[in-house]
């Protein structure tokens, strides 16, 4: 993977390239970023950058190499070339010097699973679900209700692989995705992290710092990865996914900096959220209890992910309305959304809109924890009615 294929994160990309070109990259690196930040993609791009043949040294200059050994001069590119044999192998996840570790499951009693047992599934997952999370990965290998784990057997396999000589590049690279699944068994890797064989690069890719072993945290060079800007996701949708601009402008703010969520919204949502929201608001403020019950009955069947997407859409429009009221300037959103946001301002004062946002956030939290959707949306309907009941009754057309 090329750095240029990853949306946003310009500062992180420049930092990683600078760490390599200035010989300041630790042999143990921790990329820490929330779901959908592109942390795994940055790790893949870094590994490809390190093995890229166009970044190989030329003549001796007496300086230390990436791992403290004598090196030769080289002009480092700002990205891997993408065309040399090493880059092509790295892009296909088949480079013999780049190893992958990730949570696995036991498929049969007595098995001692290793990541290499699932390497074909891993390649398919990275290609088809590029910003998937651990749940997506485990479901793709048939986990269902089974817990994922990085096993003692896997740790031993990592140590064995990285003690072998490199095949082609001069480096041996491990990308371990979701080290949160290591547990205390991760202490088996401490000696490898502290005293790695020459030419070894360990890249840990994590989401939750609180679930990492303190002994691993203290022995790795930390690179924090922020959530993406809405404009970066919008540009990625338009330029890489060929999404029409209006649709990209709607999806980007709803994803809240999460590329996985943007991917889900793009591929899994065929609902007309604007029409559903219009029907709900008219039921609340104009049409009365019978219409409210009908709406709740219909939309409680949407499914948890779509219900969360719908609430996120409503929050997005409310936030835009509040921004228009407070700043006097509309955010960059689709024309139909701008019109809806202005109608919301006529429906309620900004304080009321902000109160509705709080209720929607709370409802989304409870949906995530499997609340009964019919009860939840009926209660939410009543709460929203009481928040705006002092306003004149109008229709949202």
What is the predicted function of each stretch?
Residues 2-5, 9-184:
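Clamp-loader machinery-focused feature within the broader ASCE/P-loop NTPase space
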Residues 160, 191, 218:
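Conserved adenine-binding aromatic site and its adjacent loop/helix in ATP-hydrolyzing domains
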Residues 171-173, 177-201, 208:
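Conserved Walker B catalytic segment
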Residues 1-78, 85-86, 198-201, 207-397:
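Charged, glycine-rich active-site and insertion segments that engage polyanionic ligands
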Residues 92-94, 196, 216:
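Short, structurally constrained coil/turn elements
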Residues 164-167, 195, 239:
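Secondary-structure boundary motif
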């Amino acid at each position: 993977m090329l750095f240029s294929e990853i949306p946003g994160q310009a500062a992180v990309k420049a930092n990683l390239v600078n760490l390599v070109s200035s010989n300041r990259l630790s042999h143990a690196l921790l990329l820490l970023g929330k779901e959908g930040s592109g942390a795994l993609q940055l790790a893949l791009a870094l590994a490809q950058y390190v093995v890229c043949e166009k970044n190989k040294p030329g003549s001796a200059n007496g300086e230390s190499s990436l791992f403290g050994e004598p090196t030769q001069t080289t002009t480092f590119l700002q990205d891997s070339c993408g065309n040399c044999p090493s880059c092509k192998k790295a892009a296909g996840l088949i480079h013999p010097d780049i190893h992958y570790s990730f949570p696995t499951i036991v498929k049969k009693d007595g098995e001692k699973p290793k990541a290499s047992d699932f390497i074909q599934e891993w390649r398919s997952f990275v290609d088809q679900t590029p910003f998937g999370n651990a749940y997506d990965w485990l479901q793709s290998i048939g986990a269902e209700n089974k817990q994922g784990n990085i096993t003692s057997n896997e740790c031993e396999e990592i140590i064995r692989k990285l003690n072998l000589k490199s095949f082609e590049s001069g480096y041996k690279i491990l990308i371990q995705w979701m080290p949160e699944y290591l547990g205390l068994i991760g202490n088996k890797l401490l000696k490898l992290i502290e005293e790695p064989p020459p030419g070894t690069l360990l890249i840990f890719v994590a989401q939750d710092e609180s679930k990492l072993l303190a002994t691993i945290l203290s022995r790795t060079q930390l690179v924090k990865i922020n959530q993406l800007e809405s404009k970066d996701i919008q540009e990625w949708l338009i330029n890489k996914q060929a999404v029409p601009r209006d649709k990209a402008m709607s999806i980007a703010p709803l994803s809240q900096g999460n590329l996985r969520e943007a991917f889900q919204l793009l591929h899994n949502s065929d609902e007309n959220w604007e029409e559903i929201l219009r029907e709900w608001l008219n039921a609340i403020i104009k049409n009365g209890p019978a219409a409210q019950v009908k709406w709740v009955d219909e939309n409680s069947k949407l499914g948890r992910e779509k219900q969360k997407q719908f609430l996120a859409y409503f929050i997005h429009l409310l936030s835009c309305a509040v921004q228009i009221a407070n700043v006097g300037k509309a955010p960059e959103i689709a024309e139909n959304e701008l019109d809806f946001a202005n109608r919301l301002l006529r429906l309620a004062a900004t304080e009321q809109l902000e109160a509705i946002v709080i209720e929607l956030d709370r409802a989304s939290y409870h949906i995530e924890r499997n609340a009964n959707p019919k009860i939840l949306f009926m209660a939410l309907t009543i709460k929203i009615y009481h928040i705006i009941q002092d306003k004149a009754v109008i229709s949202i057309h």
